[in-house]
Design a protein with these regions (language model features):
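Transmembrane helices with small-residue packing motifs
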Residues: 193-202, 255-264, 287-288, 325, ...
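Signature of alpha-helical transmembrane segments and their immediate interfacial
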Residues: 175, 236-286, 294-347, 852-856
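Residue-level signature of catalytic and energy-coupling elements of molecular machines
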Residues: 4, 45, 75, 90, ...
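Hydrophobic alpha-helical transmembrane segments of membrane transport and translocation systems
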Residues: 224-229, 236, 798-855
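N-terminal membrane-entry
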Residues: 20, 73-89, 669-683, 811
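Helix-loop junctions and hydrophobic alpha-helical segments within the transmembrane domains
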Residues: 65, 72, 76, 151, ...
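Hydrophobic transmembrane alpha-helices and their membrane-interface caps
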Residues: 88-96, 100-156, 195, 213, ...
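Surface-exposed amphipathic alpha-helical segments in non-transmembrane regions
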Residues: 1-13, 24, 36, 40-62, ...
Length: 856
């Protein structure tokens, strides 16, 4: 073979290159398979890295570039901290309002329900991750509601000189119907979240599944287990009560100090032994007595306030019931006004800051890898300059730790899903490039990732000849913030409109990374036959095959070398295929076996095709996309302004072109539509569940009238938290929180209305019954609201990246329930009397006794 050809043994031609901190590099990606544990895989890799450097050639180092398990560990750590803090705050709150012994047994229901829910969620195929863990935190304050109501009622019955067991049974029976149906209505409020579509739908479904499982086991615990504890366990001394309460407190605090399961067990045994000794020798009796007396004084003052000041307030609200409703309606309008005024912008899925800032470069298709490499080098140098500036500003913790640059590929892209670490990659090409900055964890730096990306964008400026240069700082997105799809038959017309739309978008401050999906293809040679070629018996297909064999090559065979297949390619030498002129010198074989010059039988015309042809419903489409700096403007504001006239005028001038919103806007619309029908069904089921225990068709409507006020409370909650830069506005997770709040607030109203009906049936007048019911149920209703709020407080005030997208849902639920509590205690009694007034007008004059009986 050497007599007729040159044989070279080498690697396949490629345009791809990689540099890590300025040095040539290669990436090894380790991925999990099936249900493998990412934390265990990471531990194994780290153990290997501790011993691997000894066997590497000189000058070769191993560095962990993108550890996705760190994100999971940070998220789990953040949410576990929020869970511990929330549970501790709930426990303290219970101890303030209830006896320590009662607070202990109510709080014990939380881990019992969690254990049951963990078993059930595992059976349903869920795993412990950041989303499912948020579901446990979300339900933390909710699932003690039924236990609080049952426990408080049992405690009240036991104080009436009954035995512990009799008080536990009677207290549970009296309140079991509204408690059971209240939990069922709460579950119904979460069911629509199971039906959502897209990324948000998947997140909402996981959260809803966890919450529903927890509520089921919480109901079982409050109706069967809690009464058994309260009916048989009596603590004779104050020290014994405090000892019981300190068990969960110590258990939570030890979680902060234990480094593994064994250390936790050891510390727990030690602390329990110490507490037992203190209790046995009565060393803690004095402190315990003072604590119990303080709690009793606080509880007595709360009772005095409820029976005096609050009673008068409720009586006045019922007496001036139409004025009360007017104030409630004004409050409702205030929330609507906040949204309509634009002071609380809506964003479907606010971007989550990553610990990477990425610049993605796209040159015209066909650009040589050398030209792209120069542009990537420029981006890399601008990144190094920025890193140096930031290290001077923050010498103690430089924000930039590593710089990775790639030519011929964009390794962070996975179908546009955002930064995910090299290795997945988009399809390669010499016209593609990317530079990635690895940043220190968000909690360890002052500047957020978007600010660093914006500084880098300003530092780099524009790249001459670049088709697209995007700077990305988000962990993931559900689509482009602005994505306008144009469809039509005329490609030239679509390009003209796309150019005009890009120019219009550039006039908005804060709109960045504007581009469209139209891409010219590579330069190509279009072959055509001459009459001489036809006369020689050549076809265009035969000609194309010979040109491909000469310049790309023909695979002659494959040779097995170890684990690799080595392809043997036959083609012209490098010098004979470097230029277009080489084609003119090529010899073409005819069917007769002779060889004639290419220029004799064919000609080649230089031109460009399309990089890709996109069609929707058989029509050509071009997408105009852009990102927004949400600190300046939102995508909704831009699109609202465009829809106000510009887009209509554009379509009127081009009647054959259609327009649609894609990306984040389409995801938002589809998700909202997917929730509407399930939510309406859930409302109907809630109405039915309320009508069953109340034996009324109108009283469920009265109870459900508090739902809009929960939404208004959530809106004002976002407005308040926005002042502290904890939320930017409303988001899709805010909507999910509002849906969840609907079921929780209905629970409290049901218990209140059920109590009114019971008091009326026992012979009280209607006016006295509504006031006495509000006074009787005031403490448990306030306590259930406060436990929900304080259980979510650590998460609401969490500023870490891991909790960013969860905060809006927590804000909606916490503030929605809190504001609706006031409505429940003051407005629901007034609404009850208004319904009776309306019923009296419809039925006509009746005796008071008959009216009272029919109202029940």
């Amino acid at each position: 073979l050497k007599d007729v050809a040159t044989v070279s043994d080498g690697f396949e031609d490629t345009d791809q290159a990689l540099r890590f901190d300025g040095e040539p590099a290669a990436i090894i990606r380790v991925s999990r398979v099936g249900d493998q544990d990412i934390l265990k895989i990471t531990a194994e890799v780290n153990r290997y890295l501790e011993t691997a450097p000894g066997g590497l050639p000189e000058g070769v180092t191993l560095t962990v570039w993108n550890d996705n398990s760190r994100l999971l560990r940070d998220r789990l750590s953040t949410l576990l901290d929020s869970a511990r803090q929330g549970f501790l705050m709930v426990l303290i709150l219970l101890a303030l309002f209830l006896r320590p012994r009662l607070a202990f047994w109510v709080s014990i229901g939380v881990p019992v329900a969690f254990l049951g829910a963990l078993y059930l969620t595992n059976y349903l195929g869920l795993s412990i991750d950041g989303i499912s863990l948020f579901g446990f935190i979300l339900v933390l304050g909710i699932m003690v509601d039924d236990a609080i109501v049952v426990g408080e009622n049992v405690f009240a019955e036991q104080r009436k000189s009954r035995t512990l067991l009799e008080g536990a049974v009677l207290g549970t029976q009296k309140i079991s119907v509204p408690v059971i149906f209240g939990v069922l209505t709460t579950i119904c409020a979460f069911v629509p979240m199971l039906q959502g579509v897209g990324t948000s739908g998947q997140i909402g479904a996981v959260i809803a599944t966890v919450v529903i499982c927890c509520l089921i086991f919480s109901l079982i615990e409050s109706q069967l287990i809690l009464p058994a504890h309260l009916g048989h366990q009596d603590v004779k001394t104050e020290a014994g009560e405090i000892y019981l309460l300190m068990v969960p407190v110590v258990g939570i605090l030890l979680l902060e100090f234990a480094w593994d399961v064994s250390s936790y067990i050891g510390l727990a045994v030690g602390m329990v032994s110490l507490m037992t000794l203190l209790h046995a020798f009565s060393l803690s009796q004095g402190v315990a007595t003072r604590l119990v007396r303080s709690q009793e004084r606080f509880s007595e003052r709360v009772e005095v306030f409820i029976n005096s000041h609050f009673r008068r307030l409720v009586a006045q609200a019922v007496s001036a019931r139409y004025t009360t409703l007017a104030f409630a309606f004004a409050f409702f309008l205030s929330g609507v006004g906040v949204v309509l005024s634009g002071r609380l912008p809506f964003s479907f899925f606010p971007p989550l800051a990553s610990d990477q800032a990425i610049a993605q470069l796209t040159m015209p298709l066909g650009t040589s890898a050398a030209v792209t490499a120069d542009a990537v080098l420029y981006l890399e140098q601008s990144a190094e300059a920025l890193a140096e500036e930031l290290s001077e500003q923050f010498p103690d913790a430089p924000p930039v730790t590593h710089i990775l640059s790639a030519v011929g590929n964009q390794p962070s892209s996975r179908g546009g899903a955002g930064p995910s670490g090299p290795g997945g990659g988009s399809s390669g090409g010499g016209h593609l490039g990317e530079v990635t900055l690895q940043l220190t964890p968000s909690q360890a730096r002052t500047l957020d990732t978007r600010t660093i990306a914006n500084l880098w964008r300003d530092q780099a400026g524009s790249i001459p000849g670049a088709v697209e240069l995007k700077f990305n700082s988000s962990l993931f997105t559900v689509g482009n913030a602005i994505d306008i799809q144009l469809s039509g038959e005329n490609v030239g017309e679509l390009r003209e409109i796309a150019a005009a739309l890009r120019l219009k978008l550039s006039s908005y401050p804060g709109v960045i990374d504007i581009t469209d999906s139209f891409r010219s293809g590579k330069q190509e040679l279009k072959l055509s036959m001459k009459p001489e070629g036809d006369a020689a018996g050549l076809s265009l297909a035969q000609l194309a095959i010979q040109v491909r064999q000469a310049f790309y090559g023909e695979e002659a065979q494959r040779i097995q070398r170890g684990r690799d297949d080595v392809r043997v390619m036959v083609r012209y030498t490098d010098s004979e295929r470097r230029s277009v002129g080489a084609l003119d010198r090529m010899r073409v074989r005819t069917p007769a076996g002779s060889e004639i010059p290419f220029t004799t039988v064919a000609e080649a015309e230089l031109g460009r095709g399309y990089a890709s042809i996109n069609r929707t419903d058989a029509r050509r489409v071009v997408n105009v996309t852009a990102d927004v700096d949400r600190s300046v403007i939102t995508a909704e504001e831009v699109l609202s302004d465009l829809s106000g006239g510009y887009l209509n005028d554009l379509l009127n001038d081009h009647p054959r072109v259609a327009l649609s919103l894609e990306g984040e806007q389409r995801q938002s619309g589809e998700y909202l539509v997917s929730l509407v029908f399930p939510f309406l069904i859930a409302l109907f089921v809630i109405y039915a569940l309320l009508a069953i225990p109340l034996h009324s068709y109108t009283q469920p409507l009265m109870i459900m009238s508090v739902i809009p006020f929960a939404y208004v409370g959530a809106i004002w909650g976002h407005q308040i938290m926005k002042q502290f830069d904890l939320v930017a506005g409303l988001a899709m997770m805010s909507i999910l929180g509002m849906i969840a709040a609907a079921g929780v607030v209905v629970n409290s109203s049901l218990i209140l209305t059920y109590t009114v009906n019971r008091l009326v049936s026992e012979g009280e007048s209607l006016d006295n019954a509504v006031v006495n019911a509000a006074v009787t149920r005031c403490r448990p209703i306030i306590l259930t609201s406060l436990t929900t709020f304080v259980g979510l407080m650590p998460l609401m005030f969490n500023t870490s990246v891991q909790a960013q997208f969860l905060v809006p849902m927590a804000v909606s639920l916490a503030f929605g329930v809190t504001f609706a509590t006031v409505i429940t205690l003051l407005v629901v009694p007034a609404i009850y009397r208004v319904f009776e007034d309306i019923g009296g007008l419809i039925a006509g004059p009746r005796s008071p006794a008959v009216a009272t009986e029919s109202s029940v």
